[in-house]
Amino acid sequence: MRIQTRYVVLFLTLVVQASTSLVQQGIGALVPFIAAALALDHAHVGIAVASMSAGSAAFTALSGIAVDYFGERAVILSTGVATGLALVGASLVPSYGWLVFWLFVFGIGYGASTPAGGRAVLLWFTKDRGFAMGVRQTGVPVGGLVGTLLLPLVASHAGYRWALAAGGLLCIALSTAAALAYRSPDGAAHVSAQPLGELWRGMLRIARSAESLAVNATCGLLVSAQYVVISFLALSLISRAHAGIQLAAAALAVVQAAAAVGRLLWGTVSDRVFGGDRMAPMAVLCVIAAAGMLWLAALRHPSAPAALGVAAVLGLSAAAWNGLFAAVQAEIGGPERAGSSLGVGLTAIYGAGALAPPLFGALVDRAGFALAWHVLSAVVLLGVLPALTARRLLRAQRAAAAAA
């Protein structure tokens, strides 16, 4: 019964992640509609997209503590409702400033969904954790894929505001249903009964640890690539490569589909091939993502196979590292600090995600897409160094624990 239950829990965490990610990851498909309706340049588009990450970065550490204190179920329910209401709020005001504000509020709620789901997986899965985290993290690209297909369809008929409202209502419904169905494993109640002061001190210890710093440096560079690809791939293919809007939308959908496959693939590889090592695969992903962006920069008048091929490479690399991050960061914190540890890591990641799109958009406005993709490729390649450093530190930590 426990084996069956843990996979039900895994499915519920996937549903929550998908519902909250529908707009967060599908926003790239709405960008052309928002830019046209509000007459925005690339830099302002980047700021709007980045406001979601800014909200997450500002409050994710606190939400991680909330997960460890109140439990994952309460946080899943409250954040699902909050993110949905924020999107409905964004749909009610046809103003750029208010759009940025409500997307920031949405980001606050979105940032808490990963610590809650990550803690649930950590508690229910004692083995095959990389695979389980990969499955849960497929909710991000699955939600993005649904958003990529659904949101522009609604926007083309009724405008981007109705698309945001539809995404918000769907988020509320699915998150509420999943939270009501979720149950913690037997014996987990005491984990959530720690004093707030001790949770705060534990989070600070994790934030200062060399292992966590190295992991988050790598993931901060990878998330920069991921958010830029999701936000600007369609615009790049249309404006620089002169692809049609249908091909550009299809490429964005391929990114999300490939990311879903990649998160499962890399999670399984880390469990079965690398023996639980999450950082060696992450170093490989940095190299593949950098190569994919160089390929994208070289595209001019691409054929459909070329455009979809580069999208698949970017999805399998730049958008497929998340399960590895969630697994290693939760393992650093352990059952008692899983939410706090994920909150620390996500704060760094969302901070990078908030900076990357507007900086990339500003660079595009000044130098064009080709140079911007080359610069981002070089930056992502730097992630190999902290990935290998984290791998060495974590292996030494495990060896010391085994010797003790």
Regions found by a protein language model. Give the residues of each.
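C-terminal transmembrane helical hairpin of 12-TM major facilitator-type secondary transporters
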Residues: 276-325
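Cytoplasmic membrane-interface "Motif A"-like loop-to-helix N-cap segments
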Residues: 69-80, 272-286
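A late C-terminal transmembrane helix in Major Facilitator Superfamily
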Residues: 332-369, 376
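Extracytoplasmic gate region of multi-pass secondary transporters
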Residues: 27-28, 211-264
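Conserved MFS/SLC helix-loop-helix module at the cytosolic interface between two early adjacent transmembrane helices
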Residues: 58-96
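Cytoplasmic helix-loop-helix junction between adjacent transmembrane helices
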Residues: 102-140
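Juxtamembrane intracellular "pre-TM" segments in multi-pass secondary transporters
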Residues: 1-3, 185-216
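Helix-loop-helix hairpin linking two adjacent transmembrane segments in secondary transporters
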Residues: 135-184
